[in-house]
Amino acid sequence: MIDQVLADWAPVTIATVVICFLADYVLTHLGAQAARGVRDRWSIEGSYEMNPTWERQIDSGRWFSWRVLFVAASLAVLLGAVRLLVQPGLFGLGPAFFGFAAGLILLLQAPVLIAHATNLQTFRDLADPTAVQGGLHFRRWYVYRQGASYVLRFGILWLLLWIPSQQAFFIGGAVSCLLWARRMAQLGEAARPSAPETMELGLGAPEDATPAASTIP
């Protein structure tokens, strides 16, 4: 039983959550640096970071941030508190409650880390001048929509895995992925220009566009 194992090994589960969060942060910085090196071949408008909450932090190029440490510590404390709630005889909550909480974070981070790995490999390949001819510039709304579709597929996968397993871990992942996909879709709609504005913009990429990748930190 996945939920039971996660609860029994709560310290390992909590450490994994924190490590995944920090890995996401580090890989986002690495991706932003790599993207700048291939901006003449591949770029999108706006920030490399697709989560508005972290855009300024990534754009600043500063690696150290008390905010990052605060979020990492908060995740550990919250999951630790949830684990205490599922102790036998307390509040009547079973290990499924902890499994759900762990799934909310870990199964959202899974597609995010996969996207980071894909982006870094793409930028490495594009660093070869013979890899492509010309360049491609993506509008931000389109990348948001692609990100929403990407995370949605994982949400459906976790839901399908829950059906035979009946483990709350997968329900947690499905909930977080579906909610994040909805958020990305909303951001995409907000960023999409009107039809007349789109015609005025033309096909060229703006010179001041910041390279980015479809990451979901």
Predicted regions and their residues:
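Hydrophobic alpha-helical segments at protein termini of multi-pass membrane proteins
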Residues: I2-P217
